[in-house]
Every structure is written in structure tokens, then in C-alpha cells.
Amino acid sequence: GAGGTAIYPVLQIWAAKYAQKTGSRVNYQAIGSGGGIKQIEAKTVDFANSDKPLMHDEIAKNNLVQFPQVVISIVPVVHLPGISAGQMVLNGDVLSKIYLGQIKKWNDPAIKALNPKVNLPNMAILTVHRSDGSGTTFNFTNYLGKVNPEWHSKIGADTTVSWPGGVGG
């Protein structure tokens, strides 16, 4: 199999248990949801995982069955001097504006309003994102589009998007 990286730790456990019970090994390549979808459509793997659900026509065209396996959460991580784990609060609107490049510094009034007791530094914000075909990217960008109509119209939601800035990897 091949596909999403977020499910990989769970699949490792399942594969080990399956091998114990059956003596058969499961080979799974954590290459991203986009890669998994391409491989299942090309019939080069027996199963694939994607954080982005396939459309009905994709399922029918490729004679696939789709079902949920796990629930995955996406948590933005902030690393700032003097800020402790769990001390920073960001909401969807602020997060979307950070990724749109409209909020550029950590001491922006919108971030300060959510964190009135936190001493926010006058530092530039550097966003990081995935640049491969990622179901996590789809879910993250889909959320940003739901909380900010501008994100929805300018960027949209997909496994790969044209990020307005930041560092991809």
C-alpha cells in the first residue's frame, strides 16, 4: 500500500499485529495522500490511504471502495522564545490571515487580542507547509477556506495549493 503519512504510525502497529497473526507482512509506503491516490489509480498498490476523500466519480472510475479508518488532528505549532507550550491561542481567522501573509508579526493586534497576558515578541512570522500532494494540506486548507472567505476564493482547498508565502518542504 501507499499514501498518507499521518496514518503511518497506526498502520505500523496494525501491520505488526497482522504479521503476528498471519505470518504475512504488509508493505506501506508513506508518500503522501496524493502519491497514494496516484498509485491506487495506476493499480501499482493493493490499497491506499488518503486524508482527502475521493470524489464519487474517482471511486467509480477506478472501481474502488472508500471507508474511514482513523481520525487525524492537525495542530499548528508555534516556537517562540519565552512562550511556553499551551500558552499561545490562535483561532481560524487569525491563522488564515497569517498564512495569507496579512498578519506578519507575532505582536500583531489580532494575535494580542487572543493572548492578552502573553508577552508577544516583535518578530516576523515564518510559516511552514508541505509542498507535496498531502491530505493534511487538503484538510488544513479546507478549514482555512471555511473560516475565511478570502482564503476560499484566492487559495482554495486541495492536496497542493499555491501558498502565498512561507517555506515548503
Predicted region positions:
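Flexible loop/hinge segments at secondary-structure junctions
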Residues: 2-169
